[in-house]
Amino acid sequence: MQTVSENSSRGVLVADWRNGGFGVYIHWPFCAAKCPYCDFNSHVAKSIDQSSWKNAYLREIDRYADLTSGRVLNSVFFGGGTPSLMPPETVHEVLERIRFHWPKANNFECTLEANPTSVDAGRFAGYAAAGVNRISMGIQSLRDDDLVALGRMHTVAEAKQAFDIARNSFDRVSFDLIYARQHQEPESWRIELKEALYMAVDHISAYQLTIEQGTAFGDRYNRGLLKGLPEDENAERMYEITQEECAAAGMPRYEVSNHAAPGQESIHNQVYWKYGDYIGIGPGAHGRITTPQGRYGTETHLAPEIWKNSVYEGNNIESWTHLSADDQLSEFVLMGMRMASGISVHRLNELSNGSFKRAKISDLIEMSIIGESDGMLFATQTGTKLLNQVIYHILDACE
């Protein structure tokens, strides 16, 4: 059953999503094991009925195509979970159905997340043949002891081998690293990051370890058993080192945690950050869809089997929340200010119904906390460390 929550709206810009593009997110909820820091919707299953999952995805693609016909598709992202556990044949059929419904942009990007333990040359060749043209690999650390502490199932040697295999099949390969780990010091992070940058060709994501409630790490932290987490000062220094080393390697920050060579930024993630429309398919997937009636946030049921069964039964257990103009303005600023390029003043004026007052942030501009260039507002290097306050003041300037 589809549920709709209405919020008041003082005006809807039904074409605003075009400024950010259009993407499709496919959530594969299964993993070989649950990492202790992970708060994503991922599950360990003894067996998976691959055929029934494939057909559920195909049905949902058909349904959403009816709501978004005529759009040009910028990107597809297979996330999870561990999508590299999906058979290449499933990925092929999903992409075939997507291609049937939506024409692709000239620079169309299709990313699949992979863990080093689920990598083999034949599988990756199959993904490439299916139409995947970018891999995002969850390496997380180049230190074996830390991989064990993070609950990862691969070694550093296996990660490097998996990366090489991916490079043989794909022109674009990114990988994730986690810093501010237990007992980690800033200079040891610098050494590790330099090793990673020597491997990385065009894109790297570096995330600070966060302790989330509802995870194994969260439980240990609450019981005082998660020892050696860096002090805030050291964690901040590691963030600064990340900016320094990535920029020196020719991959500057284009988003808070993402670094890329020019022209190699993730197209799909920019659909999110530039506040475009995207379809979320799979258990727990979120989306943003604009219709003639307005813009909606969508969210599906978290439980894998409940989601799949609802698709087959035609119940479509998901929520559609109508986003008011204020909701859209807040989301636009929250997402866009994460990017180094920032947000368009013209679009800010449109979404705020002309209420943006530059004078209310002029002090922050003069203090070089907010930058201004070519009709864009962005957080400076100093402002990025104060991003929540920057966002607050920009939204306040739209009151």
Descriptions of predicted regions:
Residues H27-S42:
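Local cysteine-cluster metal-coordination motifs and their immediate loop/turn environment
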Residues S352-E366:
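Short amphipathic alpha-helical interaction segments
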Residues N7-G23, S42-D66, R71-S352:
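C-terminal scaffold of the Radical SAM
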Residues D120-A121, K357, L387:
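Short, well-ordered alpha-helical microsegments
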Residues M1-E6:
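N-proximal helix/coil linker or "cap" segments that precede and/or mark the start of modular domains
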Residues T382-E399:
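Short, amphipathic alpha-helical interaction segments positioned at domain boundaries
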Residues M376-T380:
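Minor-groove-contacting beta-hairpin "wing" of winged helix-turn-helix DNA-binding domains
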Residues I365-G375:
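A short, conserved structural fragment
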